[in-house]
Amino acid sequence: MPALGRFAVIAAVVAAVPLRFVTTSHLWLDEALSVDIARLPLADIPAALRHDGHPPLYYFLLHVWMSVFGEGDSAVRALSGVCALAALPLAWAAGRRVAGVRGAWWCLAVFALSPFLVRYGTETRMYALVTLLVLAGWLFVRRALERPDPVRLVPIALTSGALLLSHYWAIWFLAATVIVLGWHARRDPAARRVLVAVLAGGVLLLPWLPSMLDQAAHTGTPWAGAVRPTTMVSVSLLDLGGGDFAEATLLGFGLLALFALGVAGRATGEHTVELDVRGVAGLRSEAAVVGLTIAIATAAGYATHTTFASRYVAVIVPLFLLVAAVGGSRLPGRDAPLVALAGVLVLGAVGSGHNVLTDRTQAGVIAEHLRAAARPGDLVVICPDQLGPAIHRVLPADLTELTYPPSPLSPERIDWRDYEKRNAAADPHAFASSVIARATGAHSIWVVSSGSYRTLEGQCEAVLSDLSARYPATVVVAEDGDTYFEHAQLTRFAGTTP
């Protein structure tokens, strides 16, 4: 890579450090919920996760992290930032292993300003940990395929087990990995031993298996339905670029083009590239794992009626970016690689900057109004309960909170067990009557609400309607779904005292 390109990559790495720790956003539902679960005593976390639907490793790590660094927004997000930062030297090592020093520089560039990795480096969730484990596991597998002795096989089993205990999409990823290794194992004894090591990692999941089966029977993803693979791919490409805006679209599909080049492209001259539809040696297996993971996840989603969120592809993003980076390193000549590198870095910087400046939730705006106008003893009604964790985290402590549907876990946590069935049985009119009964003597009733949540269609509107029939209503904060991922309306109902 020319000196100018190396300088640009070094600048990107320097920028990548603060980008993985800085965002102006308040914690949204998933983040606040993670903190509320992780702050429980370690022995209580497994039982709490039976109401949530995730494996325990990240929550255990976050519990220990918070006991040292505290529970402020920056503190709880820093664990993910450290994981995202630790992935950069592994990305360099991965690129160098498959494409030499040129590939290492390209890999470092693609990973440093990846809006996806930056976003989840600033989120109190397990996705940065997952990407780190996948990168480490890939390096362990590559080393073991060269010499499959026990010293090189044990880390593979441990990493596989850690992945399974971090996110359930690791099941689809490891299933795809097993299929690819099984294909190679027909002729390669080393691949057979690596395959056994990957499967051995499943032993670490066995103690958690009863909880996982219970979660599968009672939690799932009631907030959305299964999606088509085309939707899965297109949404993921947007998230790889940083969101739903033009620069993100260009980056996402640009990375897809580089991915295709990494799978099937080879330079044949100073200005020409040949595409071999059979794929070229080097990264066909990695590309196959990416494709098979999506295929298996799609089939599983339809079979189990579970949905997809683009953050789940954290299990395959490291391999996708690795192949794309190698594709960039295969561009011939001097000018074409520099232009492509500049495009990746500039668009990546735009997407990463968007993460810094974008608030994921309207909770902060709502809390600001409540701090300014609410009085001690006022009622804050949160409908639906999914708005509860983020709102509760930023509310003044002297306000009384009620959530709909009512739950002993709210407002700090969500009870996802049989969520759709419980919501169907909930009675918004009875809830509104209970709010009115409790409002005697209150200066105001404040309702944080949104009607956009699946399984609760029309119910929050019914609560608002019943309260409006009793008290004068004023919309204080309008719901803004164009600006915020998690959005809500704040309505004030004048109470019984002036």
What are these regions (language model features)?
Residues 2-498:
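Terminal, non-globular segments
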